[in-house]
Amino acid sequence: MTPVRNQKDVEKAASRAIEALYGPEVKDIKVRVLLPFPNEHKQEGWDANVTFLSKGKQYTVDLLIDQEDGQITNARLIDMMTPL
């Protein structure tokens, strides 16, 4: 896989991961918060907070993305709700 160096690369990696986890019917994938991981001084990856819609529900997922190869090292569901 390709290195993930900036927000555009993170958006591509997050989109691929969300579609792999939740299926191709997801839409409106947005990276809401993007932080270096573990911190700014020794960055090894990205902590991305991502929202998207699927089957009438809005999901918020936290993804840890390795900077060197774009692998998702952790994916965690934060919230699932019916949008207003």
Model-derived features: positions:
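Short, non-transmembrane alpha-helical segments in secretory-pathway proteins
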Residues: 1-35
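Hydrophobic alpha-helical elements and their junctions with loops/disorder across both membrane
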Residues: 20-24, 55, 82
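Generic alpha-helix signal with a bias toward terminal, lower-confidence helices
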Residues: 22, 30, 43, 75-77, ...
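Generic low-complexity segments that are intrinsically disordered, proline-rich and/or Lys/Arg-biased
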Residues: 25, 37-39, 84
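Exposed beta-strand-loop-beta-strand "reactive/processing" segments of non-cytosolic proteins
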Residues: 29-68
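A short, surface-exposed interaction/processing loop segment used at functional sites
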Residues: 62-84
